[in-house]
Amino acid sequence: MWWSVLAVSVGAVIGANLRWGLGLWLNASYHAVPWGTLVANLSGGWLIGVLMAFFSQSSVLSPEWRLFAVTGLCGALTTFSTFSLEMFAALQEGKWGMALVGILAHVVGSILMTALGFLTFSLVRG
């Protein structure tokens, strides 16, 4: 049990810091669009696809590795709450078009990136 808690916690620390770093880097560069959140969600969607494809094909690693990578790292890297806040702010500012594009980019993009992650794994694996 404690190894599971540790695995999730360490993964979450890494994922949250990656998300924070992406926000600092990309949101500061492009003020009009919160690119850091989008990149975090899309890359996290791709990564979780690769990881789930890997873990479904492999029993070499202990379950704690899946908890670390999927629940901890990907769970903290992707961020529905920040996405929701940014889209709500766009709506409050009357930026309906930006909000709609943002919602579609995050939701549809994340699903497509997850599928791409599974495809990437199958292509690499052969």
Swiss-Prot record:
GO terms for cellular component: plasma membrane. It is found in: Cell inner membrane. Na(+) is not transported, but it plays an essential structural role and its presence is essential for fluoride channel function. The chain crosses the membrane at residues 5-25, 35-55, 68-88, 99-119. Na(+) binds at G75, T78. Belongs to the fluoride channel Fluc/FEX (TC 1.A.43) family. It comes from the Bacteria. Coiled coil: none annotated. NCBIfam families: crcB, PRK14196.1. InterPro entries: FluC. GO terms for molecular function: fluoride channel activity; metal ion binding. The keyword Metal-binding applies. It catalyses: fluoride(in) = fluoride(out). GO terms for biological process: cellular detoxification of fluoride. Fluoride-specific ion channel. Important for reducing fluoride concentration in the cell, thus reducing its toxicity. The lineage of its organism: Bacteria, Pseudomonadati, Pseudomonadota, Gammaproteobacteria, Pseudomonadales. The keyword Ion transport applies. Keywords: Cell inner membrane, Cell membrane, Ion channel, Ion transport, Membrane, Metal-binding, Sodium, Transmembrane, Transmembrane helix, Transport. This is Fluoride-specific ion channel FluC. Pfam families: CRCB. It is a multi-pass membrane protein.
